[in-house]
């Protein structure tokens, strides 16, 4: 996609995000659906769309670590833990951090933690940079169906009018690995 078309698609996506709606976009392995993490209305729309219970918690995807800092508590990390995390970012590894009390429950669910990732997908980096904050990110699929890997699959599952940022996934076969930021425990193999 040329830069003008990509810029137009990102601008259109930001308009949708500002309306507290949900968008779809390519990530490292599959298409994701996401929204503004600071909008309870938008997050509830996403959860309803996915038939996902609010208590499960969500993942935030960001262009850089600074975008994630308002949502996580990194004060307990040792230098070695930071080094491990930053050696994997940007990239397809999600880390679960402690969350401060200010992080909304619609993001953390029943947990006192939040899963976050600094992406290396160029389109998502550009989208998060243009929006100025991370996005809630979960796989683009309806309950019981496989995650979408193309724009056509997103439109088939969510409808032709669903707002999609066109682009290619990063080509990975598996979703992101998920690890505990403090212990390194593996929650999901990538």
From Swiss-Prot:
GO terms for biological process: regulation of translational fidelity; tRNA threonylcarbamoyladenosine modification. It catalyses: L-threonine + hydrogencarbonate + ATP = L-threonylcarbamoyladenylate + diphosphate + H2O. The keyword DNA repair does not apply. Keywords: ATP-binding, Cytoplasm, Nucleotide-binding, Nucleotidyltransferase, Transferase, tRNA processing. Residues 7-190 form the YrdC-like domain. It holds the Pfam family Sua5_yciO_yrdC. Disulfide bonds: none annotated. It is found in: Cytoplasm. Its EC number is 2.7.7.87. Coiled coil: none annotated. It is an enzyme of class 2 (transferase). InterPro entries: DHBP_synth_RibB-like_a/b_dom (IPR017945), Sua5-like_dom (IPR006070), TC-AMP_synthase (IPR023535), TC-AMP_synthase_SUA5 (IPR050156). GO terms for cellular component: cytoplasm. GO terms for molecular function: ATP binding; double-stranded RNA binding; L-threonylcarbamoyladenylate synthase; tRNA binding. Required for the formation of a threonylcarbamoyl group on adenosine at position 37 (t(6)A37) in tRNAs that read codons beginning with adenine. Catalyzes the conversion of L-threonine, HCO(3)(-)/CO(2) and ATP to give threonylcarbamoyl-AMP (TC-AMP) as the acyladenylate intermediate, with the release of diphosphate. NCBIfam families: PRK10634.1 (NF007919). PANTHER family: SUA5, THREONYLCARBAMOYL-AMP SYNTHASE. Belongs to the SUA5 family. TsaC subfamily. This is Threonylcarbamoyl-AMP synthase. The lineage of its organism: Bacteria, Pseudomonadati, Pseudomonadota, Gammaproteobacteria, Enterobacterales.
């Amino acid at each position: 996609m040329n830069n003008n078309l990509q810029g137009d698609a990102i601008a259109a996506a930001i308009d949708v995000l500002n309306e507290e709606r949900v968008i779809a976009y390519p990530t490292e392995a599959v298409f994701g659906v996401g929204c503004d993490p600071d909008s309870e209305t938008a997050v509830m729309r996403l959860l309803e769309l996915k038939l996902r219970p609010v208590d499960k918690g969500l993942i935030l995807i960001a262009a850089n670590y600074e975008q994630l800092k308002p949502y996580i508590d990194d004060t307990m990390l040792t230098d070695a833990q930071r080094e491990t995390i930053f050696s994997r970012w940007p990239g397809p590894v999600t880390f679960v951090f402690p969350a401060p009390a200010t992080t909304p429950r619609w993001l953390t669910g029943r947990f006192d933690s939040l899963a976050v990732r600094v992406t290396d997908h160029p389109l998502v980096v550009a989208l998060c940079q243009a929006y100025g904050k991370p996005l809630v990110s979960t796989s683009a699929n309806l309950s019981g169906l496989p995650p979408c890997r193309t724009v056509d699959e997103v439109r088939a599952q969510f409808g032709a009018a669903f707002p999609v940022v066109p682009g290619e996934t990063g080509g990975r076969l598996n979703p992101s690995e998920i690890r505990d930021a403090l212990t390194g425990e593996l929650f999901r193999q990538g």
